[in-house]
Curated annotation (Swiss-Prot):
Pathway: Cofactor biosynthesis; tocopherol biosynthesis. Residues 1-36 form a transit peptide. This is Probable phytol kinase, chloroplastic. Keywords: Chloroplast, Kinase, Membrane, Plastid, Transferase, Transit peptide, Transmembrane, Transmembrane helix. Its main location: plastid. GO terms for biological process: vitamin E biosynthetic process. PANTHER family: DOLICHOL KINASE, PHYTOL KINASE 1, CHLOROPLASTIC. The chain crosses the membrane at residues 60-78, 98-118, 122-142, 168-188, 227-247, 254-274, 276-296. It catalyses: phytol + CTP = phytyl phosphate + CDP + H(+). GO terms for cellular component: chloroplast; chloroplast membrane.
Amino acid sequence: MAAARPALPSSPTSLLLARSTSAPDLAARRPRRWLVAAAGVPAVAGALAASASTPAASMLLRDGGATLLVTAGAYSLVRAFDALTERRLVQQSLSRKVVHVLSGVFFMASWPLFSNSTSARFFAAVVPFLNCVRLLTYGLGFYSDEALVKSVTREGKREELLRGPLYYVIVLLIIVLVFWRDSPIGIVSLSMMSGGDGFADIVGRRFGSLKLPFNKKKSWVGSAAMFISGFLLSALMLSYFSWLGYIHVSWDQALGKLVLVALAATVVECIPVTDVVDDNISVPLATMLVAFLLFGNTAN
Protein backbone atom coordinates (compact mmCIF):
# COMPACT_ATOMS: atom_id res chain seq x y z
CA MET A 1 0.00 0.00 0.00
CA ALA A 2 1.46 3.35 -1.01
CA ALA A 3 2.38 5.88 1.68
CA ALA A 4 0.16 8.90 1.92
CA ARG A 5 1.70 12.06 0.49
CA PRO A 6 1.50 15.31 2.45
CA ALA A 7 -1.07 17.70 1.10
CA LEU A 8 0.39 20.38 -1.13
CA PRO A 9 -0.88 23.90 -1.41
CA SER A 10 -3.23 24.28 -4.27
CA SER A 11 -1.79 27.60 -5.47
CA PRO A 12 1.32 29.86 -5.17
CA THR A 13 -0.66 32.16 -2.92
CA SER A 14 -1.47 29.37 -0.52
CA LEU A 15 2.25 28.36 -0.63
CA LEU A 16 3.30 31.87 0.54
CA LEU A 17 0.68 31.78 3.28
CA ALA A 18 1.92 28.42 4.43
CA ARG A 19 5.52 29.61 4.63
CA SER A 20 4.55 32.78 6.51
CA THR A 21 2.68 30.82 9.14
CA SER A 22 5.22 28.06 9.60
CA ALA A 23 8.61 29.92 9.38
CA PRO A 24 9.90 32.26 12.15
CA ASP A 25 9.16 35.92 11.54
CA LEU A 26 12.72 37.35 11.31
CA ALA A 27 11.51 40.79 10.40
CA ALA A 28 9.58 40.93 13.66
CA ARG A 29 12.46 39.60 15.72
CA ARG A 30 15.04 42.17 14.59
CA PRO A 31 13.17 45.20 15.91
CA ARG A 32 12.74 43.40 19.21
CA ARG A 33 16.49 42.92 19.49
CA TRP A 34 17.10 46.62 18.79
CA LEU A 35 14.50 47.52 21.41
CA VAL A 36 16.22 45.33 23.98
CA ALA A 37 19.61 46.90 23.19
CA ALA A 38 18.17 50.40 23.27
CA ALA A 39 16.54 49.70 26.59
CA GLY A 40 19.99 49.11 28.06
CA VAL A 41 21.34 52.53 27.01
CA PRO A 42 19.49 54.53 29.67
CA ALA A 43 20.68 52.09 32.30
CA VAL A 44 24.33 52.54 31.27
CA ALA A 45 23.92 56.31 31.01
CA GLY A 46 22.31 56.39 34.42
CA ALA A 47 25.18 54.42 35.91
CA LEU A 48 27.71 56.81 34.39
CA ALA A 49 25.77 59.83 35.60
CA ALA A 50 25.57 58.35 39.08
CA SER A 51 29.30 57.72 39.14
CA ALA A 52 30.00 61.29 37.95
CA SER A 53 27.76 62.67 40.68
CA THR A 54 29.88 61.15 43.45
CA PRO A 55 32.10 63.62 45.35
CA ALA A 56 35.35 62.03 44.16
CA ALA A 57 34.33 62.11 40.50
CA SER A 58 33.01 65.64 40.84
CA MET A 59 36.33 66.80 42.30
CA LEU A 60 38.20 65.02 39.54
CA LEU A 61 36.16 66.76 36.85
CA ARG A 62 36.59 70.12 38.57
CA ASP A 63 40.36 69.75 38.90
CA GLY A 64 40.70 68.58 35.31
CA GLY A 65 38.69 71.52 34.06
CA ALA A 66 40.64 73.96 36.22
CA THR A 67 43.92 72.57 34.88
CA LEU A 68 42.81 73.11 31.29
CA LEU A 69 41.54 76.61 32.05
CA VAL A 70 44.66 77.77 33.90
CA THR A 71 46.97 76.22 31.32
CA ALA A 72 45.12 78.01 28.53
CA GLY A 73 45.23 81.28 30.48
CA ALA A 74 48.95 81.03 31.20
CA TYR A 75 49.71 80.16 27.58
CA SER A 76 47.57 83.04 26.31
CA LEU A 77 49.32 85.48 28.64
CA VAL A 78 52.76 84.56 27.34
CA ARG A 79 51.62 84.51 23.71
CA ALA A 80 50.07 87.95 24.09
CA PHE A 81 53.39 89.43 25.19
CA ASP A 82 55.17 87.40 22.52
CA ALA A 83 53.05 89.22 19.94
CA LEU A 84 53.51 92.63 21.58
CA THR A 85 57.28 92.19 21.71
CA GLU A 86 57.46 90.87 18.15
CA ARG A 87 55.56 93.94 16.91
CA ARG A 88 57.81 96.15 19.06
CA LEU A 89 54.85 97.56 20.94
CA VAL A 90 56.48 96.59 24.23
CA GLN A 91 60.19 96.65 25.01
CA GLN A 92 61.81 93.27 25.48
CA SER A 93 63.08 94.07 28.98
CA LEU A 94 59.65 95.33 30.07
CA SER A 95 57.83 92.36 28.52
CA ARG A 96 60.10 89.92 30.33
CA LYS A 97 59.35 91.35 33.75
CA VAL A 98 55.66 91.98 33.16
CA VAL A 99 55.30 88.30 32.22
CA HIS A 100 57.37 87.51 35.33
CA VAL A 101 54.93 89.41 37.56
CA LEU A 102 51.64 88.46 35.92
CA SER A 103 52.44 84.76 35.52
CA GLY A 104 53.02 84.31 39.23
CA VAL A 105 50.04 86.39 40.30
CA PHE A 106 47.71 84.71 37.79
CA PHE A 107 48.82 81.22 38.80
CA MET A 108 48.49 81.94 42.51
CA ALA A 109 45.10 83.62 42.11
CA SER A 110 43.81 80.57 40.20
CA TRP A 111 44.41 78.10 43.03
CA PRO A 112 40.86 78.41 44.45
CA LEU A 113 39.54 77.06 41.14
CA PHE A 114 40.79 73.64 42.22
CA SER A 115 38.85 71.40 44.58
CA ASN A 116 39.62 70.49 48.19
CA SER A 117 40.81 67.04 47.13
CA THR A 118 44.23 65.92 48.30
CA SER A 119 45.17 65.45 44.65
CA ALA A 120 44.20 69.01 43.66
CA ARG A 121 47.74 70.35 44.07
CA PHE A 122 49.01 67.76 41.61
CA PHE A 123 46.53 68.95 39.01
CA ALA A 124 47.66 72.54 39.64
CA ALA A 125 51.29 71.42 39.31
CA VAL A 126 50.58 70.34 35.73
CA VAL A 127 50.61 74.01 34.68
CA PRO A 128 54.23 74.82 35.66
CA PHE A 129 55.29 71.33 34.61
CA LEU A 130 54.05 71.93 31.07
CA ASN A 131 55.86 75.25 31.06
CA CYS A 132 59.04 73.43 32.13
CA VAL A 133 58.67 71.07 29.19
CA ARG A 134 58.03 73.97 26.84
CA LEU A 135 61.09 75.92 28.00
CA LEU A 136 63.29 72.84 27.76
CA THR A 137 61.99 72.08 24.27
CA TYR A 138 62.79 75.54 22.92
CA GLY A 139 65.84 76.16 25.10
CA LEU A 140 67.54 72.98 23.89
CA GLY A 141 66.77 73.85 20.29
CA PHE A 142 64.33 71.07 19.44
CA TYR A 143 61.95 73.74 18.16
CA SER A 144 62.29 77.44 17.45
CA ASP A 145 60.09 80.26 18.76
CA GLU A 146 61.78 83.64 18.41
CA ALA A 147 58.78 85.50 19.83
CA LEU A 148 58.92 83.45 23.02
CA VAL A 149 62.67 83.97 23.35
CA LYS A 150 62.34 87.73 22.94
CA SER A 151 59.49 88.08 25.42
CA VAL A 152 60.98 86.17 28.37
CA THR A 153 64.78 86.46 28.03
CA ARG A 154 67.18 89.26 28.82
CA GLU A 155 69.40 89.18 25.72
CA GLY A 156 67.20 87.33 23.23
CA LYS A 157 69.16 84.05 23.26
CA ARG A 158 67.34 80.72 23.40
CA GLU A 159 69.89 79.35 25.90
CA GLU A 160 68.57 81.87 28.42
CA LEU A 161 65.31 79.94 28.56
CA LEU A 162 67.23 77.28 30.49
CA ARG A 163 68.22 79.73 33.22
CA GLY A 164 65.96 82.41 34.75
CA PRO A 165 62.65 81.42 33.10
CA LEU A 166 63.21 77.71 33.78
CA TYR A 167 64.22 78.36 37.40
CA TYR A 168 61.07 80.43 37.80
CA VAL A 169 58.65 77.69 36.73
CA ILE A 170 60.57 75.07 38.73
CA VAL A 171 60.10 77.20 41.85
CA LEU A 172 56.39 77.49 40.99
CA LEU A 173 56.26 73.70 40.76
CA ILE A 174 57.98 73.28 44.14
CA ILE A 175 55.78 75.85 45.87
CA VAL A 176 52.52 74.30 44.68
CA LEU A 177 53.60 70.74 45.55
CA VAL A 178 55.24 71.45 48.91
CA PHE A 179 53.22 74.34 50.34
CA TRP A 180 50.03 74.87 48.29
CA ARG A 181 47.36 77.42 49.18
CA ASP A 182 46.92 76.58 52.87
CA SER A 183 50.46 77.60 53.82
CA PRO A 184 51.56 81.25 54.12
CA ILE A 185 55.12 80.19 53.31
CA GLY A 186 54.34 79.34 49.70
CA ILE A 187 52.02 82.33 49.24
CA VAL A 188 54.57 84.83 50.55
CA SER A 189 57.49 83.22 48.71
CA LEU A 190 55.69 83.36 45.37
CA SER A 191 54.57 86.94 46.03
CA MET A 192 58.13 88.05 46.74
CA MET A 193 59.54 86.25 43.71
CA SER A 194 56.94 87.41 41.21
CA GLY A 195 55.86 90.81 42.51
CA GLY A 196 58.87 91.96 44.49
CA ASP A 197 61.65 90.89 42.15
CA GLY A 198 59.60 91.81 39.09
CA PHE A 199 58.83 95.38 40.13
CA ALA A 200 62.40 95.87 41.37
CA ASP A 201 63.64 95.42 37.81
CA ILE A 202 60.84 97.43 36.16
CA VAL A 203 61.23 100.45 38.46
CA GLY A 204 65.00 100.14 38.75
CA ARG A 205 65.55 100.25 34.98
CA ARG A 206 63.41 103.35 34.61
CA PHE A 207 64.38 105.40 37.65
CA GLY A 208 67.42 103.65 39.09
CA SER A 209 70.20 106.11 38.32
CA LEU A 210 71.52 106.02 41.89
CA LYS A 211 73.22 102.65 42.33
CA LEU A 212 73.93 100.71 45.48
CA PRO A 213 77.54 101.16 46.68
CA PHE A 214 78.13 97.40 46.97
CA ASN A 215 76.31 96.35 43.77
CA LYS A 216 76.34 98.65 40.76
CA LYS A 217 73.79 96.47 38.97
CA LYS A 218 71.14 97.36 41.57
CA SER A 219 69.67 100.73 42.52
CA TRP A 220 68.21 102.26 45.65
CA VAL A 221 64.87 102.89 44.01
CA GLY A 222 64.75 99.35 42.61
CA SER A 223 65.41 97.89 46.05
CA ALA A 224 62.73 100.11 47.55
CA ALA A 225 60.30 98.90 44.88
CA MET A 226 61.27 95.32 45.72
CA PHE A 227 60.49 95.83 49.40
CA ILE A 228 57.23 97.75 48.93
CA SER A 229 55.74 95.68 46.11
CA GLY A 230 56.76 92.38 47.70
CA PHE A 231 55.23 93.41 51.01
CA LEU A 232 52.00 94.70 49.44
CA LEU A 233 51.49 91.69 47.16
CA SER A 234 52.18 89.30 50.03
CA ALA A 235 49.64 91.09 52.23
CA LEU A 236 47.11 91.13 49.37
CA MET A 237 47.44 87.43 48.62
CA LEU A 238 47.34 86.47 52.30
CA SER A 239 44.11 88.50 52.58
CA TYR A 240 42.77 86.77 49.49
CA PHE A 241 43.37 83.24 50.77
CA SER A 242 42.28 84.19 54.28
CA TRP A 243 39.00 85.60 52.94
CA LEU A 244 38.42 82.33 51.06
CA GLY A 245 39.06 80.36 54.25
CA TYR A 246 42.26 78.54 53.33
CA ILE A 247 44.38 80.21 56.02
CA HIS A 248 43.80 82.31 59.14
CA VAL A 249 45.62 85.62 59.44
CA SER A 250 46.11 87.59 62.66
CA TRP A 251 47.11 90.91 61.16
CA ASP A 252 48.45 92.41 64.38
CA GLN A 253 51.28 89.87 64.16
CA ALA A 254 51.36 89.07 60.45
CA LEU A 255 52.16 92.60 59.24
CA GLY A 256 55.32 92.83 61.31
CA LYS A 257 56.43 89.41 60.10
CA LEU A 258 55.77 90.41 56.48
CA VAL A 259 58.00 93.45 56.94
CA LEU A 260 60.85 91.20 58.07
CA VAL A 261 60.28 88.73 55.23
CA ALA A 262 60.21 91.53 52.65
CA LEU A 263 63.36 93.04 54.13
CA ALA A 264 65.18 89.70 54.00
CA ALA A 265 64.11 89.11 50.39
CA THR A 266 65.24 92.62 49.42
CA VAL A 267 68.65 92.17 51.04
CA VAL A 268 69.16 88.86 49.22
CA GLU A 269 68.10 90.45 45.91
CA CYS A 270 70.67 93.24 46.45
CA ILE A 271 73.62 90.94 47.11
CA PRO A 272 75.93 90.75 44.06
CA VAL A 273 75.66 87.00 43.56
CA THR A 274 73.46 87.04 40.45
CA ASP A 275 76.24 85.49 38.38
CA VAL A 276 76.37 82.59 40.83
CA VAL A 277 72.76 82.16 41.98
CA ASP A 278 69.82 83.45 39.95
CA ASP A 279 67.34 85.78 41.67
CA ASN A 280 64.58 83.32 40.83
CA ILE A 281 66.31 80.84 43.12
CA SER A 282 67.88 83.00 45.84
CA VAL A 283 64.85 85.22 46.55
CA PRO A 284 62.23 82.45 47.00
CA LEU A 285 64.62 80.23 48.97
CA ALA A 286 65.49 83.06 51.36
CA THR A 287 61.82 83.96 51.65
CA MET A 288 60.84 80.36 52.39
CA LEU A 289 63.44 80.13 55.15
CA VAL A 290 62.51 83.40 56.86
CA ALA A 291 58.77 82.81 56.43
CA PHE A 292 59.13 79.34 57.93
CA LEU A 293 60.97 80.74 60.94
CA LEU A 294 58.41 83.51 61.47
CA PHE A 295 55.11 81.95 60.42
CA GLY A 296 55.69 78.23 60.76
CA ASN A 297 52.88 76.69 58.75
CA THR A 298 50.22 79.19 59.84
CA ALA A 299 49.74 82.89 59.24
CA ASN A 300 49.33 83.82 62.90
